[in-house]
């Protein structure tokens, strides 16, 4: 199939590929250099869903739902018991998921095997599993073929093409979408963001259909028989940076009235923070798509602030194989020592800053900014004396315990021998009031690429205490989690060095 050269951009890296304007790119393959790595193997605010009204013309394919059923004890997971779900996952040649960032073009089907005239339009809003937080940049498409799920372990998420005749679109910053489609039975609605994937069997009537939020919501649990997949996540069960609460408020667990995770309901793995022994078993690490090492998790480990050589090598191998690695403030050694060339911390021999400082920063990533601006008022300001988002791009981050002096370009060669910068991308910047130059604007939340994986770091804690609703820095964390899960538009280059 012929097409015009298109530019595909992922953060600061721009790739060139020949892509017809109706091709869609979704992940599948594993880079050859990954083989050895794989073998070695720190609430809900009461808002109600604001999704579109349900059309009474939508029909579902007769069938039954199998697998675990929704339960009020595990929190809202966006599950609709009236919609039958499921995906044929046995055919590796069917449309795959996920796309990077690219322009999907118009509904023209030139060079696509003949004209297809849409006679139906599906509209709706994609929400987080909590049914109220909109999801920006989610892929929505309709297919009659099988859908390949994400592997149940770490993998290299390289994009592949989705057939140009497949109706597809991305959600807007407010999570909404409008998808022209062809009416008929036995179709699948696919909604995907990173490793969050939902497949819903439905019959599409002619005309306009507003899909209910319970149909268009990302799943909150791993339940393949019900057409639901989520990233496998491991998070250290520590305090005060309670990332577990943020994940629960996203919809991956039940929360109490104070916005705290009700332990036992989580759809992720809690790792005891008594030691770093989990990081000494690469095979165990490779079971997870994302690993969180929050602030206080490492602070009292016997070897702190050093990272033992075997543990350091495991972190590098895990990320190179496609893992997503996240650390915050006091756990900075788990970014600095495995990836020393990517950033320079303030006072590098003692990067843990006291006293902690608040920072009046700025959101510098345009897509993150657009999403925050599109949030409804009750999500921009949760009250209780917490910072709000009413002065964007300004954002106040609380309890920063480190400072980054610089982030550096990291130049590697792609598969064509061309230079590619895989260094950190800044999302939020601001001054460090406890640093020697308190007026200097510094990166405060960053993500970088290392082989097939990505690492992210923030100088601030994300969830220091139990509280209802999602604070600005918790929202930034969730957006970054979703964005680092998307696939690579080109085969990722090997790690630097």
Which stretches of residues belong to each language-model region?
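Ser/Thr-rich, Pro/Gly/Ala-heavy low-complexity intrinsically disordered linkers and tails
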Residues: 41-119
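Structural motif
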Residues: 122-136, 143-148
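A short, solvent-exposed beta-strand micro-motif common in secreted/extracellular proteins
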Residues: 140-142, 173-178, 184-199
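Short, acidic Ser/Thr/Gly-rich low-complexity loop/linker segments typical of extracellular
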Residues: 144-180
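Extracellular ligand-binding/catalytic regions of CAZymes and related secreted enzymes
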Residues: 335-364, 433-497
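Catalytic beta-strand/loop cores that center a nucleophilic Ser/Cys/Thr
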Residues: 357-466
């Amino acid at each position: 199939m012929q097409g015009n050269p298109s530019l595909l951009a992922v953060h600061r890296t721009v790739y060139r590929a020949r892509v017809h304007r109706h091709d869609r790119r979704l992940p599948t393959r594993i880079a050859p250099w990954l083989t050895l790595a794989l073998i070695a193997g720190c609430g809900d605010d009461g808002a109600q869903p604001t999704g579109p009204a349900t059309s009474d013309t939508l029909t579902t394919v007769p069938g039954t739902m199998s697998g675990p059923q929704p339960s009020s004890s595990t929190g809202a997971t966006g599950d609709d018991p009236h919609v039958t779900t499921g995906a044929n996952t046995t055919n590796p040649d069917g449309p795959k998921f996920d796309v990077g960032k690219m322009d999907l073009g118009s509904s023209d089907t030139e060079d696509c095997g003949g004209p297809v005239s849409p006679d139906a339009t599906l509209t709706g809003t994609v929400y987080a599993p909590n049914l109220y937080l909109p999801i920006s940049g989610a892929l929505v498409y309709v297919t009659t073929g099988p859908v390949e799920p994400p592997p149940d372990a770490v993998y290299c998420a390289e994009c592949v093409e989705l057939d140009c005749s497949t109706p597809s679109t991305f959600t807007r910053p407010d999570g909404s979408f409008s998808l022209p489609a062809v009416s008929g039975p036995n179709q699948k609605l696919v909604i995907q963001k990173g490793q969050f994937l939902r497949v819903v069997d439905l019959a599409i009537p002619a005309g306009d259909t507003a899909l209910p939020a319970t149909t268009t919501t990302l799943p909150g649990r791993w339940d393949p028989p019900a057409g639901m997949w989520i990233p496998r996540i491991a998070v250290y069960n520590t305090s005060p940076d309670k990332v577990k609460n943020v994940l629960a408020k996203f919809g991956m667990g039940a929360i109490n009235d104070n916005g705290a995770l009700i332990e036992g309901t989580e759809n992720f793995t809690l790792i005891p923070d008594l030691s770093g022994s989990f990081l000494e078993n690469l095979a165990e690490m490779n079971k997870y798509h994302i690993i969180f090492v929050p602030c206080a998790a490492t602070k009292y480990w016997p070897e702190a602030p050093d990272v033992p050589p075997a543990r350091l090598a495991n972190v590098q191998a895990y990320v190179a194989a496609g893992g997503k690695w996240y650390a915050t403030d006091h756990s900075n050694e788990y970014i600095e020592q495995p990836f020393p060339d990517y950033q320079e911390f303030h006072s590098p021999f003692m990067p843990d800053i006291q006293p902690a400082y608040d920072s009046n920063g700025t959101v510098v990533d345009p897509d993150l900014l657009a999403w925050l601006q599109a949030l409804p008022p009750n999500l921009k300001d949760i009250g209780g004396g917490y910072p709000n988002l009413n002065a964007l791009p300004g954002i106040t981050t609380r309890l920063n315990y480190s400072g980054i002096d610089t982030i550096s370009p990291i130049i590697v060669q792609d598969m064509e021998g061309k230079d590619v910068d895989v260094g950190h991308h800044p999302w939020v910047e601001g001054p460090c009031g406890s640093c020697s130059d308190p007026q200097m604007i510094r990166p405060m939340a960053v993500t970088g690429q290392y082989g097939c994986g990505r690492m992210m770091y923030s100088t601030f804690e994300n969830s220091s205490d139990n509280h209802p609703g999602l604070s600005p820095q918790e929202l930034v964390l969730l957006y970054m989690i979703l964005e680092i899960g998307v696939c690579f538009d080109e085969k990722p280059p090997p790690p630097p060095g």
